[in-house]
């Protein structure tokens, strides 16, 4: 079992590493490529576009051909794209490399969640996804620090060589450690069960909405945090970095505590707690009389996301034993596109950073609480799920 957990964690971590590690080198990259920092900030959106594009096909291929045939090319593409970015001499080539990086990371991301669905029952999967969420929260803190240390001695290209090295590690794990987990092709008698795993299942769609809104909350916070903390609240850059590190610490602490909470409370209770924390955060930020109270509201956002997201993802994947790859892809596409669409629309309409965050917090909590209350699982979830591996 440990091999599957190690491989899944490694496959997922390419995604946040590809986002956060290069940011510290952005000024030098812009100078070397004769582009403005503003022009290169689109590299974030290009990377996410690559991930979304990969998810359109990766899940279906993973369900038909297996997890390894998607993970291995995905890791290889991430390596090649990282090297391509390091060799880019124009901003156009650099952005093309970032899109390819996103494609590779997207393939690996989809496979990671499919593997966890293949190998873990619902309760254990919820615990592991909560731990994974905590580890993912470490990357936005550690990656820029590692990038800064690298750039003290080496040029910005070394950041992408470091990412390539990470990709090589994932490729080696996928080649030599990961074993195929895709369930065996169903017999004719099992076809009705395969056909019953519909993406239009009300319970699955409700969890897609809940997780998409939750990701929209956390990405809205990350996207607006420089404006909120430095421009509106007046913190210095160093203080901003400290606050963001503390919020990551809150996320990690809650994420690592959630598996223990699942041993005491029902998953539904934790999901309700998550949305109540979002609602409390929105109200706190809306009526906040001081910076201290606002910072408390921000910690509620991080705690709310960490306590409920892994549980919701586990529930979303639960009904899909034969189509876990497609389900994972659908979740990823909805989360990436839905959150990006909200942030873009809010900016186009002219909603301020503060109101943008308060609005998504309150909308997410109300909609999600209604879905949790009124949309129950369509079938009982087995306490244990036997894995039928390919020979």
From Swiss-Prot:
One of its GO terms (biological process) is response to antibiotic. The keyword Transport applies. The chain crosses the membrane at residues 4-24, 42-62, 69-89, 93-113, 131-151, 158-178, 203-222, 245-265, 269-289, 293-313, 331-351, 356-376. Keywords: Antibiotic resistance, Cell inner membrane, Cell membrane, Membrane, Transmembrane, Transmembrane helix, Transport. Its main location: membrane. It is found in: Cell inner membrane. One of its GO terms (molecular function) is transmembrane transporter activity. CDD domains: MFS_MdfA_MDR_like. Coiled coil: none annotated. It comes from the Bacteria. It is a multi-pass membrane protein. Confers resistance to chloramphenicol. HAMAP family: MFS_MdtL. Belongs to the major facilitator superfamily. DHA1 family. MdtL (TC 2.A.1.2.22) subfamily. This is Multidrug resistance protein MdtL. It comes from Escherichia coli (strain SMS-3-5 / SECEC). The lineage of its organism: Bacteria, Pseudomonadati, Pseudomonadota, Gammaproteobacteria, Enterobacterales. The gene is mdtL.
